[in-house]
Amino acid sequence: MKTYYEKDANVELLKGKTVAVIGYGSQGHAQAQNLRDSGVEVVVGVRPGKSFEVAKTDGFEVMSVSEAVRTAQVVQMLLPDEQQAHVYKAGVEENLREGQMLLFSHGFNIHFGQINPPSYVDVAMVAPKSPGHLVRRVFQEGNGVPALVAVHQDATGTALHVALAYAKGVGCTRAGVIETTFQEETETDLFGEQTVLCGGVTALVKAGFETLTEGGYRPEIAYFECLHELKLIVDLMYEGGLTNMRHSISDTAEFGDYVTGSRIVTDETKKEMKRVLTEIQQGEFAKKWILENQAGRPTYNAMKKAEQNHQLEKVGAELREMMSWIDAPKELVKK
């Protein structure tokens, strides 16, 4: 595994160039501000609206996507996956010039062929492994978050060097930048989200909550045991792995972990995980998600509404009112 650090990257490669950050959401605002603080010339390309005004207030030169691409030598696409192909076709593609670099922080659209850049531009990825607010905060503290770097197309012969310069400008080489491929990043990212981080965890939490409430236990107690305390466990794992978590919990809990975990996540569960991975590798999930967006998201919206109306969510909202230390969002926004 090749990992790059500060000594391996030269942010001076970006000096005299302009970086266009397309999109000004979680990653967009963080990467743009970190680059600017590293002495890089940055413009923001977004359509008129809330993000346009926020970027302007933050002191950036804000312009249309088309103008930003024409202005820049490096173009970083930081829009949601489902928006990128449309924006690329509408404002990026016709304005690309020989020798430019097209950057991504997730490989979905390149790997699954939704964006097909011309052969005369570099195509690379710099993917910080943290949400935008943490990318920014840790940078301001003088540190950085780890990231992945990949080169899909090296038209100039300098794609990796420029990508590493970008990673250094964002602060990621302070922690370490691991070399990967668009395929590996995309497929593992989707797999992790679907089977563990999002799909797996939410299904497990709901199943535990429902088992307790169906067994006659109060929903408030079920919420505490199956959702609320999950943060305590995940934080311990995040800080020091499974061993640290098991060292920190009671011996009773640890023994229960050993003798019960494999009864819940069974060999059949792992077989299903492998089937999910195959679907991702063969592009079945990508096709399903692309078609879902083209159809106006009927399944997505119906499932989202059903999940929001689950008893777990209603009980949780009431209990969180008791927790003064939680800064509950007044408005739900994508991070």
UniProtKB/Swiss-Prot annotation:
<keyword id="KW-0460">Magnesium</keyword>
<feature type="binding site">
    <location>
        <position position="189"/>
    </location>
    <ligand>
        <name>Mg(2+) 2</name>
    </ligand>
</feature>
<protein>
    <recommendedName>
        <fullName>Ketol-acid reductoisomerase (NADP(+)) 2</fullName>
        <ecNumber>1.1.1.86</ecNumber>
    </recommendedName>
</protein>
<dbReference type="GO" id="GO:0004455">
    <property type="term" value="F:ketol-acid reductoisomerase activity"/>
</dbReference>
<dbReference type="Pfam" id="PF01450">
    <property type="entry name" value="KARI_C"/>
</dbReference>
<feature type="binding site">
    <location>
        <position position="47"/>
    </location>
    <ligand>
        <name>NADP(+)</name>
    </ligand>
</feature>
<feature type="binding site">
    <location>
        <position position="250"/>
    </location>
    <ligand>
        <name>substrate</name>
    </ligand>
</feature>
<dbReference type="GO" id="GO:0009097">
    <property type="term" value="P:isoleucine biosynthetic process"/>
</dbReference>
<dbReference type="GO" id="GO:0000287">
    <property type="term" value="F:magnesium ion binding"/>
</dbReference>
<keyword id="KW-0028">Amino-acid biosynthesis</keyword>
<comment type="similarity">
    <text>Belongs to the ketol-acid reductoisomerase family.</text>
</comment>
<feature type="active site">
    <location>
        <position position="106"/>
    </location>
</feature>
<feature type="binding site">
    <location>
        <position position="132"/>
    </location>
    <ligand>
        <name>NADP(+)</name>
    </ligand>
</feature>
<dbReference type="InterPro" id="IPR014359">
    <property type="entry name" value="KARI_prok"/>
</dbReference>
<feature type="binding site">
    <location>
        <position position="229"/>
    </location>
    <ligand>
        <name>Mg(2+) 2</name>
    </ligand>
</feature>
<feature type="domain" description="KARI N-terminal Rossmann">
    <location>
        <begin position="1"/>
        <end position="180"/>
    </location>
</feature>
<dbReference type="InterPro" id="IPR036291">
    <property type="entry name" value="NAD(P)-bd_dom_sf"/>
</dbReference>
<dbReference type="GO" id="GO:0005829">
    <property type="term" value="C:cytosol"/>
</dbReference>
<feature type="domain" description="KARI C-terminal knotted">
    <location>
        <begin position="181"/>
        <end position="326"/>
    </location>
</feature>
<dbReference type="GO" id="GO:0009099">
    <property type="term" value="P:L-valine biosynthetic process"/>
</dbReference>
<keyword id="KW-0100">Branched-chain amino acid biosynthesis</keyword>
<dbReference type="InterPro" id="IPR000506">
    <property type="entry name" value="KARI_C"/>
</dbReference>
<comment type="pathway">
    <text>Amino-acid biosynthesis; L-valine biosynthesis; L-valine from pyruvate: step 2/4.</text>
</comment>
<dbReference type="InterPro" id="IPR013116">
    <property type="entry name" value="KARI_N"/>
</dbReference>
<keyword id="KW-0479">Metal-binding</keyword>
<comment type="pathway">
    <text>Amino-acid biosynthesis; L-isoleucine biosynthesis; L-isoleucine from 2-oxobutanoate: step 2/4.</text>
</comment>
<keyword id="KW-0521">NADP</keyword>
<comment type="function">
    <text>Involved in the biosynthesis of branched-chain amino acids (BCAA). Catalyzes an alkyl-migration followed by a ketol-acid reduction of (S)-2-acetolactate (S2AL) to yield (R)-2,3-dihydroxy-isovalerate. In the isomerase reaction, S2AL is rearranged via a Mg-dependent methyl migration to produce 3-hydroxy-3-methyl-2-ketobutyrate (HMKB). In the reductase reaction, this 2-ketoacid undergoes a metal-dependent reduction by NADPH to yield (R)-2,3-dihydroxy-isovalerate.</text>
</comment>
<feature type="binding site">
    <location>
        <position position="51"/>
    </location>
    <ligand>
        <name>NADP(+)</name>
    </ligand>
</feature>
<feature type="binding site">
    <location>
        <position position="225"/>
    </location>
    <ligand>
        <name>Mg(2+) 2</name>
    </ligand>
</feature>
<feature type="binding site">
    <location>
        <position position="189"/>
    </location>
    <ligand>
        <name>Mg(2+) 1</name>
    </ligand>
</feature>
<feature type="binding site">
    <location>
        <begin position="81"/>
        <end position="84"/>
    </location>
    <ligand>
        <name>NADP(+)</name>
    </ligand>
</feature>
<dbReference type="GO" id="GO:0050661">
    <property type="term" value="F:NADP binding"/>
</dbReference>
<dbReference type="InterPro" id="IPR013023">
    <property type="entry name" value="KARI"/>
</dbReference>
<feature type="binding site">
    <location>
        <position position="193"/>
    </location>
    <ligand>
        <name>Mg(2+) 1</name>
    </ligand>
</feature>
<dbReference type="InterPro" id="IPR008927">
    <property type="entry name" value="6-PGluconate_DH-like_C_sf"/>
</dbReference>
<feature type="binding site">
    <location>
        <begin position="24"/>
        <end position="27"/>
    </location>
    <ligand>
        <name>NADP(+)</name>
    </ligand>
</feature>
<dbReference type="Pfam" id="PF07991">
    <property type="entry name" value="KARI_N"/>
</dbReference>
<keyword id="KW-0560">Oxidoreductase</keyword>
